[in-house]
Curated annotation (Swiss-Prot):
Protein name per UniProt: Endosome-associated-trafficking regulator 1
Superkingdom of the organism of origin: Eukaryota
GO biological process: cell division; cell projection organization; positive regulation of cilium assembly; positive regulation of protein localization to cilium
Similarity annotation: Belongs to the ENTR1 family.
Any one GO cellular component localisation term in the record: ciliary basal body
Transferase is among the record's keywords: no
Keywords: Cell cycle, Cell division, Cell projection, Cilium biogenesis/degradation, Coiled coil, Cytoplasm, Cytoskeleton, Endosome
Signal peptide: none
Region (Disordered): 46-77, 93-129, 153-173
Recorded name of the encoding gene: entr1
Naturally occurring in which organism (per UniProt): Xenopus tropicalis (Western clawed frog)
Length: 346
């Protein structure tokens, strides 16, 4: 199969878990270790350049891909182990065949993006090694896959450098089983984090909506307060105008009050003079009234006398009038007798 070839060393290397110190040293030297992956998340440009240089040095070498017993219990997940030779230790590995091969474990979420593994051909001395093929060793694609996967780091004892020995297949199976468990835990944690992210997004959306509503309410409140402030300002101006008018009216009223007080004083003086005059007139009227009464009594007596004289003269006139009427009737009767006499004589 393309992308797989036999290792250049005569003696096969086995994968075992090394000590922490040696693992840390090899991690620092290996550009494809888990620490380099963490560095790629922090300094992506630096790791990308290092990985490109490492791939350029190893371009004439090939890796062998194997499919190990890494099937998950549910039959749907497959854990793949990548294996790369350290380009910085290439000369030492050529001189000493017993030196350790460097490798790094990566989460299955990252490794699944690089394609399936193929079984190794016969003649590998019974060793099981896991790695990428030559066609999968493009530095840019590998670094991009690491940068796209943001996962928590596995336990310290599970991501160090490992080696295989011909008689330690049980150790490799135990390591693979631990890696499978770690992969399942990481996948569960990934799902849990995704659900948390969804909940946080929903919470963020609701909070953003609340913020927008509060902003709208705040704007409306500010507009209302501005309108109320304008109304209050207009009311204050109107009140100030009213106060000015009231002060003017009060000043006018005070002037009128002073004038009225002066007039009241004058009127009181006049009233006192009028009262004195009335008292004097009353005193003078009493004396005049007595004289008027006497004169009126005399006039009444004279009038009674005149009336009695007038009544007697009236009686005389009535008697003369009756006599005159009697004379007139006699004259009329004489005229009638004369006419009758004249008519009776031939």
């Amino acid at each position: 199969m393309s992308g797989s070839s036999k290792q250049p060393h005569a003696k096969g290397k086995t994968l075992i878990i090394e000590d922490d110190c040696e693992a840390e040293a090899l991690d620092e030297a290996n550009p494809f270790s888990f620490k380099e992956f963490v560095k790629s998340q922090t300094f992506p440009g630096f790791v990308s350049s290092n990985s490109k240089r490492a791939f350029s040095k190893d371009s004439n070498q090939s890796t062998t891909q194997f499919r190990g017993p890494s099937e998950c219990p549910d039959g749907n997940l497959e854990f793949q182990e990548t294996y790369f030779r350290d380009p910085t230790l290439y000369d030492d590995l050529q001189e000493d065949e017993d030196d350790d091969w460097s490798g790094s474990y990566h989460p299955s979420v990252i490794e699944n993006t690089h394609g399936p593994k193929v079984p190794s051909p016969a003649g590998t001395d019974g060793d099981e090694s896991y790695g990428y093929g030559a066609s999968d060793m493009s530095g840019d694609g590998l670094i991009t896959g690491w940068q796209q996967a943001v996962l928590p780091s596995p336990p310290a004892g599970l991501h160090g450098k490992t080696q295989h020995r011909p008689d330690s297949t049980s150790d490799s199976e135990e390591g693979l089983r631990l890696l499978q468990i770690n992969c399942e835990e990481l996948q569960e944690e990934n799902l849990h984090l995704k659900s948390k992210i969804c909940k946080l997004k929903e919470l963020n959306d609701s909070q953003n909506e609340k913020v927008r509503q509060l902003e709208r309410k705040l704007e409306e409140r500010i507009l209302e307060e501005q309108k109320e402030a304008q109304d209050l300002e207009s009311m204050v101006q109107q009140v100030e105008k009213n106060l000015q008018m009231m002060t003017k009216r009060a000043a006018k009223a005070e002037g009128n009050v002073t004038k009225l007080k002066q007039e009241m004083a004058l009127l009181q003086i006049e009233l006192t003079t009028y009262k004195a005059e009335n008292e004097a007139l009353r005193r003078g009227e009493t004396a005049g009234m007595n004289a008027v009464k006497q004169n009126s009594n005399l006039a009444l007596e004279n009038l009674q006398k005149v009336v009695s004289g007038a009544q007697s003269s009236i009686k005389q006139l009535v008697a003369g009038a009756e006599a005159l009427t009697l004379v007139a009737e006699l004259l009329r009767s004489i005229d009638k007798i004369a006419e009758i006499h004249n008519d009776g004589v031939p």
